[in-house]
């Protein structure tokens, strides 16, 4: 009996050891560093350092990087560089010419090296009413375009750049644009209730009659922190004219409260720890800002950080100036 027990323990040990070894192998593969070529590495380093540059220098550097990436031979790293640059190019006001070069580069990379469709996701829909001869959950695959196409469609839809006709006819690009349009439709018809740092409850629909600027942010987000003083300045300047600014964070109050206190932010900061409102607005990256007019219509939005000058232009669309 003792020998059988010992044998089971030995077998269990080796099974556990194999599982741990497999987990370590997977973790190691996931953390494997990207290997850049001699031509790619300097560009990757420059992209990594963009946020440390002054805005006027950053604009020129971003444009120069877009042109240099375009000259690289086709590769997965070339696409990676183009996507990374695109994600940073919208953090402020670097000029239309700069954004156009970034979009042109991303489009050209996708033309020369198209990204395959990702594996379909499986959506599970639980039946609310019992059906005869059926039980459990119904599933259906949904096809999401690859992220680079979403990134390019985002630049076109929200930054108003242009891309070649053959890209706009691409099936994944069209799917990405359709997804963005559907997301905006959701944002047109929503309501939510959240509590602020003091425990006061705020309901979005009860703010009709005011221009409401909803800003999604986090304490760890550099561009969020950078635009916070401009949001505070706008709130102080236009609150008497009916502007309400609502900051929404998915972090704990213990992190948010000292940050807000140290920066003397006076507009309401709401907590969304379960990310229900983030999901309602389809927020997948921050900062994101949505501006609603006095009738509750979505009048303007920004996909990234904005300068005070840019915010003023957006507020004009909602009737604040």
Question: Which stretches of residues belong to each language-model region?
Answer:
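Bacterial N-terminal signal peptides that target proteins for export
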Residues: 2-14
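Bacterial N-terminal signal peptides
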Residues: 11-23
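Mature extracellular/secreted ectodomains of secretory-pathway proteins
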Residues: 61-166
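N-proximal helix/coil linker or "cap" segments that precede and/or mark the start of modular domains
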Residues: 143-191, 205-208
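A short beta-strand-turn-helix
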Residues: 193-212, 238
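Short pre-active-site segment immediately N-terminal to redox-active cysteine/selenocysteine motifs
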Residues: 210-212, 216-220, 252, 285
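Structural microenvironment flanking redox-active thiols in thiol-disulfide oxidoreductases
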Residues: 225-263, 273-280
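Thiol/disulfide oxidoreductase modules built on the thioredoxin-like
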Residues: 259-266, 271-318
């Amino acid at each position: 009996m003792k020998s059988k027990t010992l044998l089971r323990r030995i077998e269990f040990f080796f099974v556990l050891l194999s599982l741990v070894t497999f987990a370590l192998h997977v973790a190691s593969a996931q953390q494997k560093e990207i290997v850049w070529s001699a031509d790619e590495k300097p560009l990757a380093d420059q992209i990594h350092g963009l946020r440390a540059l002054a805005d006027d220098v950053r604009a020129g550097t971003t444009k120069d990087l877009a042109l240099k990436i375009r000259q690289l031979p086709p590769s997965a790293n070339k696409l990676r560089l183009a996507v990374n640059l695109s994600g940073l190019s919208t953090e402020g006001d670097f000029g239309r010419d700069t954004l156009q070069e970034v979009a042109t580069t991303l489009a050209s990379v996708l033309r020369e090296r198209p990204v395959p469709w990702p594996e379909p996701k499986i959506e599970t829909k639980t039946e609310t009413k019992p059906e005869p001869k059926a039980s459990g959950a119904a599933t259906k695959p949904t096809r999401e375009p690859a992220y680079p196409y979403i990134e390019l469609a985002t630049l076109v839809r929200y930054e108003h750049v242009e891309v070649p006709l053959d890209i706009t006819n691409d099936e994944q690009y069209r799917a990405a644009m359709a997804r963005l349009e559907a997301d905006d439709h959701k944002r047109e018809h929503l309501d939510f209730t959240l509590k602020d740092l003091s425990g006061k409850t705020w309901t979005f629909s009860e703010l009709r009659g005011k221009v409401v600027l909803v800003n999604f942010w986090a304490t760890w987000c550099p561009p969020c922190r950078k635009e916070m003083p401009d949001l505070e300045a706008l709130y102080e300047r236009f609150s008497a004219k009916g502007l309400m600014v609502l900051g929404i964070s998915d972090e704990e109050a213990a992190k948010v409260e000292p940050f807000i206190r140290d920066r003397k932010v006076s507009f309401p900061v709401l907590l969304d720890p379960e990310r229900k409102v983030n999901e309602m607005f389809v927020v997948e990256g921050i900062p994101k800002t949505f501006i609603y007019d006095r009738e509750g219509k979505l009048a303007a939005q920004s996909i990234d950080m904005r300068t005070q000058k840019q915010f003023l232009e957006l507020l004009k669309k909602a009737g604040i100036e």
